[in-house]
């Protein structure tokens, strides 16, 4: 008889995509996979596309400003716990896996209360509030970065198989000549500061220093981005979404991007040099911590948004392809290509 896992993840792609990788791995191994999500969250749109059974819980973030949110917190918690308990009784999982987002808190607490084995995966270098609380009741804790939570095991963040399968940096760079290849990733929302600063920086470069540019900006910002490049007379391939992320990493010599946990894992798995601009308003400034993982190993440059200027970005004129290859290899040395398998294996080991 096949076993059942209840996967809890929601809110952002950084939680959902790694959880999907594990969910697919377990389903391929014969497991029944059920997903606990918020009907108003990103997971409600993404997860059903992969054919997973859903159960729903309406639960809002524990953090937040405003007197009304604080007054309603007890009601929010009680409702969340009740719905979490109802989901566990309905699904009858052999193990529960929390992959991040506030949605994991009520389900995780009810798993512990009912004696269902609970595995937590923390993607970021600084543990989120839900995982910090749940860590005291979890049976196993695994992390995307080293030394995040006491008693946690560093397994890395699951990435898409096609990214983990990219050829080694030395092999990719072997026949590469001509202009440097610059990939700018703004994310699904488009990082407006990158959309404004990078075109201005490229305008400061001489013709011989001008890289080939692929710039992803998010659907809402694509026309403004094209106008920014046109205004400074710089050619760039502007896209709202990168369909083939593995192909984009494989093509690039250098990536400019934010420092979300999944992005860091992909940069390491692909083995590509990067300039990391952490999102300054991330909870607990966790993106700076994420970035330092690659920076301290020599695989990336850290450029805080407060120091982000066209002149600072234009310093890429000083980077040689051989230097970027060396950085790419250092980034690749930190990769955890078996992260998906490791999380799935731990779930299998402790399932009742």
Curated annotation (Swiss-Prot):
One of its GO terms (molecular function) is UDP-N-acetyl-D-glucosamine:N-acetylmuramoyl-L-alanyl-D-glutamyl-meso-2,6-diaminopimelyl-D-alanyl-D-alanine-diphosphoundecaprenol 4-beta-N-acetylglucosaminlytransferase activity. InterPro entries: GlcNAc_MurG, Glyco_trans_28_C, GlycoTrans_28_N. It is an enzyme of class 2 (transferase). Pathway: Cell wall biogenesis; peptidoglycan biosynthesis. GO terms for biological process: carbohydrate metabolic process; cell division; cell wall organization; lipid glycosylation; peptidoglycan biosynthetic process; regulation of cell shape. The keyword Transferase applies. Pfam families: Glyco_tran_28_C, Glyco_transf_28. Gene3D superfamilies: Glycogen Phosphorylase B. It is found in: Cell inner membrane. This is UDP-N-acetylglucosamine--N-acetylmuramyl-(pentapeptide) pyrophosphoryl-undecaprenol N-acetylglucosamine transferase. It comes from Dechloromonas aromatica (strain RCB). The gene is murG.
């Amino acid at each position: 008889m096949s076993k059942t896992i209840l996967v809890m993840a929601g809110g952002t792609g950084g939680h959902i995509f790694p959880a999907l990788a594990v969910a697919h791995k377990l389903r391929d191994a014969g497991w029944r996979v059920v997903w606990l999500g918020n009907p108003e969250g990103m997971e409600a749109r993404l997860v059903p596309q992969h054919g997973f059974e859903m159960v729903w819980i309406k639960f809002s973030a524990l953090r937040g400003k405003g007197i009304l949110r604080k007054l309603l917190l007890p009601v929010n918690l009680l409702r969340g716990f009740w719905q979490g308990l109802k989901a566990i009784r309905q699904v009858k999982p052999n193990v529960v896996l929390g992959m991040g987002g506030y949605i994991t808190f009520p389900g995780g607490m009810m798993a512990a209360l009912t004696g269902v084995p609970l595995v937590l995966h923390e993607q970021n270098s600084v543990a989120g509030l839900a995982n910090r609380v749940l860590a005291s009741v979890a049976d196993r804790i695994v992390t995307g970065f080293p030394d995040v939570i006491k008693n946690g095991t560093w397994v890395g963040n699951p990435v898409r198989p096609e990214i983990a399968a990219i050829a080694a940096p030395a092999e990719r760079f072997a026949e590469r000549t001509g202009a440097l290849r610059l990939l700018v990733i703004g994310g699904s929302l488009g990082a407006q500061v990158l959309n404004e600063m990078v075109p201005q920086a490229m305008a400061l470069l001489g013709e011989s220093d001008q890289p080939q540019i692929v710039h992803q900006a998010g659907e809402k910002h694509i026309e403004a981005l094209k106008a920014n490049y046109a205004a400074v007379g710089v050619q760039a391939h502007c896209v709202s979404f990168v369909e083939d992320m593995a192909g984009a990493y494989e093509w690039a010599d250098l990536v400019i991007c934010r420092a979300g946990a999944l992005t860091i894992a992909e940069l390491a798995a692909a083995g590509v040099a990067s300039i990391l601009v952490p999102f300054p308003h991330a909870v607990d400034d966790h993106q700076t911590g994420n970035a330092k993982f690659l920076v301290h190993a020599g695989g990336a440059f850290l450029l805080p948004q407060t120091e982000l200027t066209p002149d600072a970005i234009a310093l890429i004129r000083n980077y040689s392809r051989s230097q970027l290859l060396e950085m790419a290899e250092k980034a690749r040395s930190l990769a955890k290509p078996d992260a998906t398998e490791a999380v799935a294996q731990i779930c299998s080991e402790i399932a009742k």
